Amino acid sequence: MQERTPPARDDGCTRTALFRRAAAGGAVVAGGALLGARRGNGTSLAAPTADTDAKILNFFLLLEQLQEAFYREALRRTRPAGALGEFARTVVRQESEHVAFLTERLGSRARARPKPDFGDALSTPEQFRAAAIDLEETTIAAYIGQGANLTRDAIGAVGTLLSVEARQAAWVLDLAGKSPAPNAADPAQGSGDIVAHLRRQGYIT
């Protein structure tokens, strides 16, 4: 199937825009998905606190750091062309903003960058595309799975990131000739399942 690039649009993903939208309690739909995660497979804690926020946001930071490294290395190693290349160039910029946003929010609590190993996932454009789908969908499941454990302030901030992750997933699914929105509701996964999956993929140890 011929790869298609979605219509040009303002991605609204500068750090200033992210903070403005977070402060306004933006991403209502994504925030609703996070609040509704208690009905999914995520682990729901009794009462969200600032400490649990820091732990969960660091988990999300790990995922965003992995994605940024993945797309940056893909541009260097795989060198995707055409619409797939445009996707990779756009998403690496967005993931870089996500990393900066979470790092600034966490301050001194922010985790160090991991040293991922993407192995054969970047051997060919086709393998890169398949791995990108998996990584985007894994990140979305993680956000939904931990959403109910965040304070409302953190949900408002994280919702602005989740909505962008969903658009990224839809974009790369479309490039692969698949439905960009195959389900009425996305599944949730707990952090333990997410980390185990990333280890099986060989991305982290």
Predicted ranges, named:
Residues 2-14, 23-205:
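All-alpha RGS (Regulator of G-protein Signaling) helical domain and cognate RGS-like helical scaffolds
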Residues 18-19:
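Hydrophobic/basic alpha-helical segments enriched in Actinobacteria
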